[in-house]
Amino acid sequence: MGKIIGIDLGTTNSCVAIMEGNQVKVIENSEGTRTTPSIIAYMDDNEVLVGAPAKRQSVTNPKNTLFAVKRLIGRRFEEKEVQKDIGLMPYSIIKADNGDAWVEGHGEKLMAPPQVSAEAVRKMKKTAEDYLGEPVTEAVITVPAYFNDSQRQATKDAGRIAGLEVKRIINEPTAAALAFGLDKAEKGDRKIAVYDLGGGTFDVSIIEIADVDGEMQFEVLSTNGDTFLGGEDFDQRIIDYIIGEFKKEQGVDLSKDVLALQRLKEAAEKAKIELSSSQQTEINLPYITADASGPKHLNLKITRAKLEALVEDLVERTIEPCRIAIKDAGVKVSDIDDVILVGGQTRMPKVMEKVKEFFGKDPRRDVNPDEAVAVGAAIQGQVLSGDRKDVLLLDVTLSLGIETVGGVMTKMISKNTTIPTKHAQVYSTADDNQGAVTIKVFQGEREMAAGNKLLGEFNLEGIPPAPRGVPQIEVTFDIDANGILHVGAKDKATGKENKITIKANSGLSEAEIDQMIKDAEANAAEDHNVRELADSRNQGDALVHSTKKALTEYGDKLDAGEKEALEASLKSLEEVLKDTSADKAAIDAKVEELGKVSQKLGEKMYADMQAQQAGAAGAAGAAEGAAHAGGAQQAADDVVDAEFKEVKKD
């Protein structure tokens, strides 16, 4: 069996590693570097360049040089973050037939983000094969912890397109924790925070490393993040600043010039890196553009203080997810033993300072932020291949559920539940003789389904006619170790079932998941009111249904006046339920009124039941007397002596 390689498929850079015995090896690519730019260029002669060669020619071929495609993977074209990127990217982002955000490269050719990302994966595969001297067919690929189901599926697809069987998708912070934990000699339980600020995404995870009978157990206690915040956004702030300064000085807007934009991107990234180790840098771009007066040159000094002012709010945005992660993990900041920084952007002094300020301790400097994730993926690959037995990884998921009556989000699996996991619950129909149900699957923290992200839906048909509430439909949520969701629904009476693996085309947008959690906290009162209104409506619907049924069976036992009052109250409740603007108080008042008016009907039903029971008891007494009369003879005739053995069913 060949080795399972570990791939960190990053927004800005990618990296590949393998395990050799118990030693990890981060493999150098054909250009001699241990990280490869996640840049893909499509040339006129159909050649595809990946990494440094693609980056080198980007200035002269901006429309066919694709970068930061990971920000689009598993996303819908309409999402505001995709729309924002359309104005910033020199290449074209197009709406595909299925509504996804695709890219245009190599002339008019449309490509899906997994297809483009597959080129970077293929480069990592080739890098490993060149080093090992044998084919590589299996890999563990990492994703941001806050990637949703469709984004994970799209990443898995990228691996498959590249010719790899993706054995596991694991979260980047978890992979970094694996790399850190196995490299340290400290014994005993430790709680660590992994702060992962990469090129396009931000994650924070609180992870407990425990020594259980010689086995290292990595348990993710909580995770949080922002899937549209990263180094690319820091670069963009510098680009916007340069464009503004140049326009003030020269009166020329560089934002409309794709060639100039590509040069600015390169210069901004270089300046940002230099300002991590020096207080000032100079951006010098001769012949950046030209107008009627001749060529224009760009020369601009930027200080570290200026950069920090430009990105201050971006750095600040990373702190709220840290607070939520600490709270969700049920720990205090003081309980954290180590803070690990992952992602190239964490080299920025301002980021380190902010992390130290929040966690109250210096982050560890002995973890390579560019390589730790790939190293962790390689370790997980060794575990999956059976070559390593002393590591157990317990990762977590986000909240998942289905929409139930009244638009309520009924959670099947709560956030930060350890995966793999499975949960089943029985639901029923909302209407009489309902022949089919639609199962809508959502991801998010809001109480009402509409406030969450729809991942997918499917129908269960062929339910036999029955009154509402009678059919039993078992819905099962099953999340595998990759964090990919499988949902099934089964009618327990007929055995009919339907199931899907959620492959929603959309991906969660910039702070959509993050926003869901914030909204859930900020709008808790509003959500509670909406939930209570839905409950009142459901209660009203149920009362209307049961009252109508009782009227049909026992209405003739009521006086004309009683029946008329009951029907009027029933109609009044039905009208208020039809009124979409009716509030909870109005519905509750009508429910209470109908409850009082229908008491007489209840009394008639109860009296009727008692009469039936009395009649049944009288008939039973008569039968018993007859039995005594012929007792002995009947016993002799009907009873057979026999041995018996009790068989217990499992």
Curated annotation (Swiss-Prot):
<feature type="modified residue" description="Phosphothreonine; by autocatalysis">
    <location>
        <position position="201"/>
    </location>
</feature>
<keyword id="KW-0067">ATP-binding</keyword>
<keyword id="KW-0597">Phosphoprotein</keyword>
<dbReference type="InterPro" id="IPR012725">
    <property type="entry name" value="Chaperone_DnaK"/>
</dbReference>
<dbReference type="InterPro" id="IPR029047">
    <property type="entry name" value="HSP70_peptide-bd_sf"/>
</dbReference>
<keyword id="KW-0346">Stress response</keyword>
<dbReference type="InterPro" id="IPR013126">
    <property type="entry name" value="Hsp_70_fam"/>
</dbReference>
<dbReference type="InterPro" id="IPR043129">
    <property type="entry name" value="ATPase_NBD"/>
</dbReference>
<dbReference type="InterPro" id="IPR018181">
    <property type="entry name" value="Heat_shock_70_CS"/>
</dbReference>
<dbReference type="InterPro" id="IPR029048">
    <property type="entry name" value="HSP70_C_sf"/>
</dbReference>
<dbReference type="GO" id="GO:0005524">
    <property type="term" value="F:ATP binding"/>
</dbReference>
<comment type="similarity">
    <text>Belongs to the heat shock protein 70 family.</text>
</comment>
<keyword id="KW-0547">Nucleotide-binding</keyword>
<comment type="function">
    <text>Acts as a chaperone.</text>
</comment>
<dbReference type="GO" id="GO:0140662">
    <property type="term" value="F:ATP-dependent protein folding chaperone"/>
</dbReference>
<dbReference type="Pfam" id="PF00012">
    <property type="entry name" value="HSP70"/>
</dbReference>
<dbReference type="GO" id="GO:0051082">
    <property type="term" value="F:unfolded protein binding"/>
</dbReference>
<keyword id="KW-0143">Chaperone</keyword>
<protein>
    <recommendedName>
        <fullName>Chaperone protein DnaK</fullName>
    </recommendedName>
</protein>
